[in-house]
């Protein structure tokens, strides 16, 4: 409890004017639970003090006191920043709105009834002065006012809970020095005073007549034991001229110990009842045997409270009785000295043989009751329920799962007489548990498993290969697989299709390797890239086509594949005639020309493609070279067939010469309707799908395939 607070100020003897002697306090309410003691010299002053009203202390006085209090504080000094100041929280006290309501109801009682009810209590006179500034703080504090004529006109206010020593003065001196002024006891005197000095009207909020909405309702959670805090309250009671000090404790209690309204009224009005302070907190006393035990931390208490709330909520649901019973047994085990983290739900570990789910209701009741049953009774019960347990296990496992487990046991070298490897989802067989010698689930059996030892023995007998040695992968044969088909024609066709598929895969692999070397296998690679579009080289027609597309489009940049020095020069000359900026970038075989659009570049609309093509053809008319191979593609150089134009050029024969195993003419397109030979055959009655020859002598439907062979030569070479 806090120490007493003393407030001392000078009171001039000659001053009889009405003033407030408390510069930072304000009288808010006066009750009849405390006492004021004063000598003869201050009687007139206290009479004026008793008739104080809240309006005597104006806002001007409040501003003056506040300004003088905060003028030289650290907040306005400027030496300390606001963010560096600590934040101190001041408690507003313990609120008791019910007592305020009782006082309001008592004020409404007629004066006659109040005089009769207080006739027997005139010997006890108490005055309560509330010194709390906050309106929410309604804790009644003890205020003892001592006025001594020998103290040179000084007044001391003491807030204390210590008892006065009645033996220090004689009864005659006490009778001469003590005077009591009842402010609220006599209703008639107070009504007369109010008629002369009416108190200010305080507006009272009327209850709303509208029905409350469920969305605006506030549900208060009472919480746990944290709210059961006592607030000490000191009351000075004077009986027969002797002042005594008693301390009461405000303790919220449950519904079972809460007294009724009639009992509270009778106890409050009874003058013989004096509240007695409880010096010790209510709680369970610990025995000396548990004094040496390690105290529980706050986290443990919080976990216990959470678990207690969970059990209370689960107990309301009848479907969760089993879980509630198990959790209740868990709490009992912890109280008996068990581990705080040991949760025993009646089942063992995942490798243990006994399972709670496999037990019947009678067996669970027998185990939970803890009654002493003989081993013979347990054996008889196990033998009677053995068939039922096996049926339940067989029902849980389907045929597919059982076959898989049996196959796994055969791989491990185990017999199929007893099922050993059983997963958790299928439950656990009790037959193996009884054969292993376990009749009851004991703590020692939780750490051992008969199945684990059986599996370990089975693995010890196995001759496993050395897994550290890498197993070489079987190389795929280049020969076609054996299809094992009786029909030779179908088998030959399958082998031919297989070989063609292998060739196509090989070609795609070579193409990917080429593109990977050029960096064209990126995720952002565009199929319109000229390096992808022309993997081998470009013709003069390709130059003109790409230049026309660049002039019509709105692209700012066009990059060509790597070309030799003469090819780059030809492209620069064509670009210069249309005011297109051209520049070569890269080194060695990767040097390539790049075209850039400028402000002076001649542009064409999409509908002007004919005009653009005509101008580009006129600009490339004097170019004698017709083919421009890529400089970054390596390959043998040879003579190229003449295409009817002047001049010749040496190009890469990689795109013109067939590879090993390719079929000649396999990629040749079908002859169209404009072909003269096909038109002549169609006039003679031939159509697609018909064989050539007479009706009796049909020719072949498929042409004779010619496969390129370079590795071997001569007859009989395959």
From Swiss-Prot:
Its main location: cytoplasm. Residues 537-599 form the R3H domain. Residues 283-293 have a biased composition (Basic residues). It comes from the Eukaryota. Residues 375-400 have a biased composition (Acidic residues). One of its GO terms (cellular component) is cytoplasm. Keywords: Cytoplasm, mRNA processing, mRNA splicing, Nucleus. Residues 673-718 form the G-patch domain. One of its GO terms (molecular function) is nucleic acid binding. Gene3D superfamilies: R3H-like domain. It is found in: Cytoplasm; Nucleus. It holds the Pfam family G-patch. Belongs to the SQS1 family. May be involved in splicing. This is Protein SQS1.
